[in-house]
Amino acid sequence: MKAIVYSQHGLPISNENSLYDTDVAKPQPGPRDLLVKINAIAVNPVDTKVRNGAPTETPRILGWDAVGVVEAVGAEVSLFKVGDAVFYAGDISRPGSYAEYGLVDERIAGHKPRSLSDADAAALPLTSLTAWEMLFDRLEVKKEEQAALLIVGAGGGVGSILTQLARKLTHLTVIGTASRPETQSWVKDLGAHHVINHHQPLAEQLAAIGQPTVRYVASLTHTDTYFPQLVEVLAPQGKLALIDDPATLDAMPLKRKAISLHWELMFTRSLFQTADMQRQHEILQQVSELVDNHTLKTTAGEHLGTISAANLRKAHALIESGQARGKIVLSGF
C-alpha cells in the first residue's frame, strides 16, 4: 500500500527526504482492531514534533487523525462492522494515518458524523478528544456549575473545540484569549462570552469585564510565559490544565492558593491500555452526534489536496510557520 514516511528525524521540511512516498505491506488486524481504508486525514502539531524530535530505526508513518471505511475487523470486535464509516485519532505508539490503510483499536474509534465530508470530519478527532478530556476528565467541570473558564489560545485547534464544548455543554462563563483581530472574531463566533488579548496583562482585562478571578484555566500554548499571570487570576482552590510542553514548570507558586495542576494528553489511554480506554470511543460517538445535530462545527481550515509527501511537506511547513488557521486536511490518494 502507499504510505508517506520519514526515516531521519530533524530534517528541515524543505528537504524532500523529510517526508517521502513509499510502499509498505498492508497491515493485518489484531483481535480488537479495525482495518480502515483511509479516505482523509488531518495534520497536527504533534506530527511535526515527532518528525523533528523522534529518532526512528525504520521508516515511520506519522498522522493521528483519520476518516475512512472499515474493510476488516478483528475476531473480538463488537462496536463496528465492515462498511462502517469511522473517525479516530489513533495511538501514537502505532503506525499513523499517512497511508492507504491503517489499524485502530475499536475502543478509540467512533462512527463518523454523517453530516460532514470525510475531509471536514478528519479535522475533529484529536482536538475533540483533547478538549473533552481536558474539560470533563482533568478539570472535572460539572455541566450545571456556575463558574468561569479562561482558555489561553482559544483560536487554535484544541481551543476552537474547547470553546464550543464549554459554551454548548456547560453553564460556564467562557473567556477566550486571542491576539489577532480575525482570531478574536473567530473565537467570538465559536461562542466565547468574552475575548481578551493574551499579549496584554490578563488581570486588568479580566477585571474590566467583571471577572477578576476564574475557577478554571485551560492553558493551550506558551504556558511557561503566562504561568505567573495564570496563578494571579486563578481563584483559591482553582484548577489549571495544560497540554503544551514547557521545558520546566515550577509548581510552588500554586501552593498558597491550593491550585491543582492537570496535564492532558489524549494518547495516554491508548499508550497504557487503561481500563477506561473505551471512553474515547464514547466521546467520539457523542462528538459525532453533536456535529450532526449542529451543536458543534468542524474546525477544518485549509484543504491541501491529496495525501502525498509533497502536500504533507506543505502542511508541515504551514504548521511550523505558525500561519495555519483551522485544521489542515487532505483527502484521497
Predicted segments with their positions:
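Glycine-rich beta-strand-centered segment in the early N-terminal region that forms part
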Residues: 25-42, 50-95, 108
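Short amphipathic alpha-helix with an adjacent loop that forms part of the alpha/beta core around
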Residues: 201-212
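C-terminal capping/lid region of NAD(P)-dependent oxidoreductase domains
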Residues: 289-302, 313-333
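Mid-domain Rossmann-like dinucleotide-binding core that forms the NAD(H)/NADP(H) cofactor-binding site
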Residues: 124-200
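N-terminal Rossmann-like NAD(P) cofactor-binding module of classical short-chain dehydrogenase/reductase
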Residues: 87, 215-218
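NAD(P)H dinucleotide-binding glycine-rich loop of Rossmann-like/cofactor-binding domains
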Residues: 89-153
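Glycine-rich phosphate-binding loop and adjacent beta-alpha segment
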Residues: 225-296, 332-333
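Short, glycine/polar-rich helix-capping loops at beta-to-alpha or helix-loop-helix junctions
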Residues: 97-98, 179-186, 248-251
